[in-house]
């Protein structure tokens, strides 16, 4: 059956700053094309590489042992060390793909993965390592996000992520300054050292049992001006939620206080306005997470995402052999993360940065074609 609109166009995000990702876990390469970045932005492979290094696997006991260097190659869009206004293409070649362990899942979908649904949607699909649905494709997110971060950084915006929960271990609330200073000081990427130690124990325990564990990642934006966002379906928080839900294993998004607002009265959580010492409008609290009516208020923007446990586990699970159409069991082999939250942090930052870059251009805070007076 052929349906109207039966095409796939879900590999791109953004209107004026547009990022398209491509590639699969065990294909030749993964990457991104960024269209709409103004000319004149200083940009090098190192700017992108430092972000990719934060996402890179094989860096410790808390991540998959898949040892990829993840070296980025910029193919276009840069001239004499600056963007030239044309599409920026960046790729990372897959060098350590091991497809042997995936032959047994061709007809037996792994519980928690998209194997069955992708097969139902596309019939012919790359099942190795999750294919296009693998976490490895988030390299494209990070490439696009690195460019976006560099762009909005020129205008005073910073995007910082950290892990606030792993399993049932929750971090204490810390200052925005502490997040920036301490989140990268431990392998869990948690700004609360006490909680970080407990989180690490939980992750290692899950790994020892052939299991995995989920958690919560928070992203904080500082320096965003008031006025970012469009009605009604292009609200800033709507676009942020869409971008964050585009990350594999993300099952929920909160902006500001999120679902907790349901427990309160308006008199308890309304963010009241005042004038600061510089005469700028601020709010006494920030339960809205820096966004009111879908438009940024000038206060810090906060978002949280719920990340499910990595579904690839060696614990026996029930499934169906789709070739024989009979029930069976499966134990997933291969190299997998016992908790992907630490590696999701730079991906979540990238997703938010891409949305901010797009809205900064759309709202007129960044010229759409060039930076500076040259």
From Swiss-Prot:
<dbReference type="InterPro" id="IPR020541">
    <property type="entry name" value="Chorismate_synthase_CS"/>
</dbReference>
<protein>
    <recommendedName>
        <fullName>Chorismate synthase</fullName>
        <ecNumber>4.2.3.5</ecNumber>
    </recommendedName>
</protein>
<dbReference type="GO" id="GO:0005829">
    <property type="term" value="C:cytosol"/>
</dbReference>
<keyword id="KW-0028">Amino-acid biosynthesis</keyword>
<comment type="function">
    <text>This reaction introduces a second double bond into the aromatic ring system.</text>
</comment>
<feature type="binding site">
    <location>
        <position position="55"/>
    </location>
    <ligand>
        <name>NADP(+)</name>
    </ligand>
</feature>
<keyword id="KW-0274">FAD</keyword>
<dbReference type="GO" id="GO:0004107">
    <property type="term" value="F:chorismate synthase activity"/>
</dbReference>
<dbReference type="GO" id="GO:0009073">
    <property type="term" value="P:aromatic amino acid family biosynthetic process"/>
</dbReference>
<comment type="pathway">
    <text>Metabolic intermediate biosynthesis; chorismate biosynthesis; chorismate from D-erythrose 4-phosphate and phosphoenolpyruvate: step 7/7.</text>
</comment>
<keyword id="KW-0285">Flavoprotein</keyword>
<keyword id="KW-0521">NADP</keyword>
<dbReference type="InterPro" id="IPR000453">
    <property type="entry name" value="Chorismate_synth"/>
</dbReference>
<comment type="similarity">
    <text>Belongs to the chorismate synthase family.</text>
</comment>
<keyword id="KW-0057">Aromatic amino acid biosynthesis</keyword>
<feature type="binding site">
    <location>
        <begin position="132"/>
        <end position="134"/>
    </location>
    <ligand>
        <name>FMN</name>
    </ligand>
</feature>
<feature type="binding site">
    <location>
        <begin position="308"/>
        <end position="312"/>
    </location>
    <ligand>
        <name>FMN</name>
    </ligand>
</feature>
<feature type="binding site">
    <location>
        <position position="293"/>
    </location>
    <ligand>
        <name>FMN</name>
    </ligand>
</feature>
<dbReference type="GO" id="GO:0009423">
    <property type="term" value="P:chorismate biosynthetic process"/>
</dbReference>
<keyword id="KW-0456">Lyase</keyword>
<dbReference type="GO" id="GO:0010181">
    <property type="term" value="F:FMN binding"/>
</dbReference>
<dbReference type="GO" id="GO:0008652">
    <property type="term" value="P:amino acid biosynthetic process"/>
</dbReference>
<keyword id="KW-0288">FMN</keyword>
<dbReference type="Pfam" id="PF01264">
    <property type="entry name" value="Chorismate_synt"/>
</dbReference>
<dbReference type="InterPro" id="IPR035904">
    <property type="entry name" value="Chorismate_synth_AroC_sf"/>
</dbReference>
<feature type="binding site">
    <location>
        <position position="335"/>
    </location>
    <ligand>
        <name>FMN</name>
    </ligand>
</feature>
